[in-house]
Amino acid sequence: MAQKEEAAAATEAASQNGEDLENLDDPEKLKELIELPPFEIVTGERLPANFFKFQFRNVEYSSGRNKTFLCYVVEAQGKGGQVQASRGYLEDEHAAAHAEEAFFNTILPAFDPALRYNVTWYVSSSPCAACADRIIKTLSKTKNLRLLILVGRLFMWEELEIQDALKKLKEAGCKLRIMKPQDFEYVWQNFVEQEEGESKAFQPWEDIQENFLYYEEKLADILK
C-alpha cells in the first residue's frame, strides 16, 4: 500500500517537474522521483550561508549547481521623489519555471504606471534563453522599468542560442554585468544569514578575482 502511495506521489511530482512518466516502471527511476520534492519557488529575505558559498561561487565549471538563486532590490520612485524600496531572494527548486520568471510572477506581477522602477538582480548565473525572452518582453511593454542584472557565472555561454539571448537582452536595454568581488561582499552582507559563530566579514575564495576577469572577458566578447 505504501509503495502504491509513493508511486502515485512520484507520478504527480514527475508531472509537475516535466519528467517522462513512461519510465516509472524502472525501480531506480521511481526511487529518484520519490525523493524529488514537488516544484516550488522559495522566497525570503536572507538565504543560508552554505547556499551562498556553493551556489554563488563563480567557478568556471558549475557542476552540481542546478538551481538559480536571485537576490533583488526594487526601488519604486513616485513623481514626488519618494522611493519605496524592497529586497529579498528567490530560489527555484526542481523547476521548469526559473527564478527570473518567478520574480515577475510573484514579486512584481504588475507595474504602476505612475512609478519608475529601478530593479537590481544579483543572480548565481546568467539567464537561460527562455528567461531572457521573458525579461525582454517585460522590458518592451514596461517603459518605466530599468533592470540591472549582475551574475556570478555565465550559463552555457558557449551555446549560440545563449549568446544571442544575451545580446538581445542588451539591445532591449537590460544592463548585464559580471559580479565583482565587491558585489559578492554586498550580497553576503545584505542577503545572507550568517551561521552562528561565523565571522560576519565576507571571506573571498581564492580564485574569485581570477574567475571574475575570466567571465568579464567572455561577456565582453559576446556583447561586442
UniProtKB/Swiss-Prot annotation:
Homotetramer. Keywords: Hydrolase, Metal-binding, mRNA processing, Zinc. Its cofactor is Zn(2+). GO terms for biological process: cytidine to uridine editing; mRNA processing; positive regulation of gene expression via chromosomal CpG island demethylation. The active site is at 100 (proton donor). This is Probable C->U-editing enzyme APOBEC-2. It comes from the Eukaryota. It catalyses: cytidine(6666) in apoB mRNA + H2O + H(+) = uridine(6666) in apoB mRNA + NH4(+). SUPFAM superfamilies: Cytidine deaminase-like. Probable C to U editing enzyme whose physiological substrate is not yet known. Does not display detectable apoB mRNA editing. Has a low intrinsic cytidine deaminase activity. May play a role in the epigenetic regulation of gene expression through the process of active DNA demethylation. GO terms for molecular function: cytidine deaminase activity; metal ion binding; RNA binding. Its EC number is 3.5.4.36. It comes from Pongo pygmaeus (Bornean orangutan).
